[in-house]
């Protein structure tokens, strides 16, 4: 039907007869000659329709609407020197049409313009409602082609490393850990339910028990959770698992995988190995386990310096088991007013969103003099001031912002303020140097965190992470006592403050798995009911194994420079988990519900 893609033609094709298919991007009449920009996935080419080629051909071209689907036959020729368009890859040539067939006309009104020549922004709601049209836009086509290149590169890399692709079930059982499941009622097994998988976690471990040794899958996963710009109810993971490899080997292999993707997509050679921080280091220095290391303003714990200070907000927080931390804003005296730090100010509001009651501040003046509220200035002695300025590195003109209280709240508040100021003050580099892509492994996570509401431990990642051998010891009788303080052999890959993926070495000892489930409050009978198939498998010669999963939607978002993963997915959902194009989710008939033995109790408030 066609000989070439529109965007494939170059000067080497001059004097060739070609047959092209595509959409009318725009059509214009210049002095009795009609120029059609014909667009397909590969790009755009200028078609020239001269009346000398026939009146019927010219009349057909005159009546064309944008987005009409055409087939063009013609001769490739050079453009006149004054008509060369350096912005187009095909800008040195054009096609003189000698045949034109309308394959499908546009009969309705277009809700927005698709043309590459129209930079008019379109509301996202309208784009999502007419996604089939939105996908024709150059930006969206480019994003999806880049997504394809990313996944193709990953597949080739893993296959070259001896991995095989295996599909795991989409209809599985609900488990108590993790986010809320999407549930699917079974018609055949009345009263019972499937769950859509949040990840292939258990199945990929069972594949290792089954002796497949190296597995990967481009997996569809589902989580019924509140959404934000980089979350979707259904998403794509590059899921990887391997046997007989230690943590160091797994990290190095996946560094090479990421480097291969960045080389193929961006043409960038990433420096290897990636830096590493322990979880405790990340929390101490950045207040988060997903630190953005492209800029400074790291957190400083100044509790030891200020613990005996007369300012009760500081000394009281420390005495209660909390901490006082600060960040130093370079030249902050000139950039940030007191109004912004006090209640109602934008910086105060950022801290408050993280649960902090407020922020304290010190302004550093010449000769190490300081300005602050009286309660701080009057209660900070010269020794404390000297130690504070030395530890923070603050100099004249700098602003020190303090958080005081529970350490977790202080970390969260100062992390939020740090990110806010990093963006606002232009501290984040945007040029194409190594600082643009700051990869980082965060390792040595705690096995568990406290659920204060329920007064019980929860797995920080999931309950299948293997604990650190040094923390656990070799005596199974001591495991229950040591587990709550143990570190997990877990690792997350972070890029510019965003988590790209994470994983761990897995528990391959059945007794240890039972004890971990007990530690998170799962009774043995319930553990057997929920995870008996896994524990049985671990008793049948399970090999040491581990793996990880990368969020492909987020990776593609970063590679394309988009702000939302919705612009890297062909048919995404909104932040209300709706598809505006198909109007899913939607109601179903009573007959369908009756077949499933399901009754809806929903009452429409209208």
Curated annotation (Swiss-Prot):
InterPro entries: Aa-tRNA-synt_II, aa-tRNA-synth_II, aa-tRNA-synth_II/BPL/LPL, Asp-tRNA-ligase_1, Asp-tRNA-ligase_1_N, Asp/Asn-tRNA-synth_IIb, AspRS_core, GAD-like_sf
Keyword RNA-binding: no
Classification via Gene3D superfamilies: Bira Bifunctional Protein, Domain 2, GAD-like domain, Nucleic acid-binding proteins
GO CC, any one term: cytoplasm
Cellular localization per UniProt: Cytoplasm
Annotated EC: 6.1.1.23
One GO MF term attached to the UniProt entry: ATP binding
HAMAP family xref list: Asp_tRNA_synth_type1
Family classification: Belongs to the class-II aminoacyl-tRNA synthetase family. Type 1 subfamily.
Protein name: Aspartate--tRNA(Asp/Asn) ligase
Organism this protein belongs to: Prochlorococcus marinus (strain MIT 9313)
Name of the gene: aspS
